[in-house]
């Protein structure tokens, strides 16, 4: 019994000493953390690809290769994957994406590692098909999205990924305008984004985006401008523009995309990928077009 008492006292003392050696400091909000996209690799927390006001009625499986040329000798090559899954209806999706693995060459040498996993729930909250009036075609489509970023990305010590979770919510709205042989799609989005930084702090940001797309039966063109405003104002306000060309043949969608970092995202990006649309909701009031063009 005496031996157990001595062991218990020893464990209690070691716990007290271990806690005493870990200082808990009050956050200094006036000092920026530097945990921001301008000072990390291209996959740390990039500008999120915006929705265009619609969810998907198909199971979409995407695989791509992408390269980043840094403005300051920071070059990266990634394998990228994404999947959209309808939740038994075209009006709600689960989306999962990540840079599966990347190889990089930066100022302090070469390396490689896995990236962060993102998962989102995308819900249609407004659609013109829900209204049976002659002017229903003028009603825009709207979606809300809630997403989580994991802390699975590797090599925080070499400034490749944040060693912390994050999340964002956004609202997107879009409208299709039929022209002679093409459809013009205009969309906008706004939201809130947050990620943990250090010493119990977090960075909050306002998201924004505008998009214009032209869709023909076999090809589509898309241009997007977007970014977010972090509150620290220290490398945390990335702004980018993207141009995308895609083909559409029997459920397959090969594409090529270029992205240019205007501010706080010092990279050129080139992505080449393929999306396969699988109709898994047949005979459930889904459109025949796999990309839901209205």
Residue ranges of model-derived segments:
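Solvent-exposed residues in well-ordered beta-strands and their adjoining turns
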Residues: 124, 174-176, 275-277
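Detector for outer-membrane/organellar transmembrane beta-barrel domains
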Residues: 162-230, 239-240
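Short intrinsically disordered coil segments
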Residues: 136, 161-162, 188, 287-294
């Amino acid at each position: 019994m005496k031996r157990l008492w001595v062991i218990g006292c020893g464990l209690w003392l070691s716990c007290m000493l271990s806690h005493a050696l870990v200082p808990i400091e009050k956050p200094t909000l006036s000092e920026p953390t530097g945990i921001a996209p301008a000072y990390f690799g291209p996959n740390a927390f990039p500008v999120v690809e915006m929705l265009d006001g619609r969810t998907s009625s198909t199971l979409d499986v995407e695989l791509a290769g992408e390269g980043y040329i840094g403005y300051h000798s920071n070059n990266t090559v990634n394998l990228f994957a994404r999947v959209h899954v309808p939740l038994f209806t075209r009006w709600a999706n689960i989306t999962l994406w990540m840079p599966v693995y990347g190889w990089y060459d930066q100022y302090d040498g070469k390396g490689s590692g896995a990236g962060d996993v993102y998962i989102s729930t995308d819900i249609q909250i407004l659609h013109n098909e829900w209204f049976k009036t002659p002017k229903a075609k003028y009603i825009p489509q709207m979606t809300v999205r809630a997403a989580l970023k994991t802390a699975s990305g590797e090599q925080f010590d070499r400034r490749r990924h944040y060693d912390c979770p994050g999340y964002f919510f956004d609202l997107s709205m879009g409208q299709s305008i039929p022209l002679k042989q093409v459809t013009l799609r205009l969309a906008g989005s706004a939201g809130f984004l947050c990620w943990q930084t250090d010493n119990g702090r977090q960075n909050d940001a306002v998201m924004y985006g505008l998009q214009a797309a032209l869709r023909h039966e076999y090809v589509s063109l898309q241009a997007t401008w977007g970014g977010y405003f972090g509150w620290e104002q220290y490398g945390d306000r990335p702004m980018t523009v993207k141009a995308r060309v895609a083909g559409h043949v029997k459920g397959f969608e090969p594409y090529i995309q270029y992205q240019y970092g205007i501010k706080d995202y010092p990279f050129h990006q080139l992505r080449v990928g393929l999306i396969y649309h699988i109709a898994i909701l047949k005979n459930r009031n889904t459109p025949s077009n796999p990309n839901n063009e209205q």
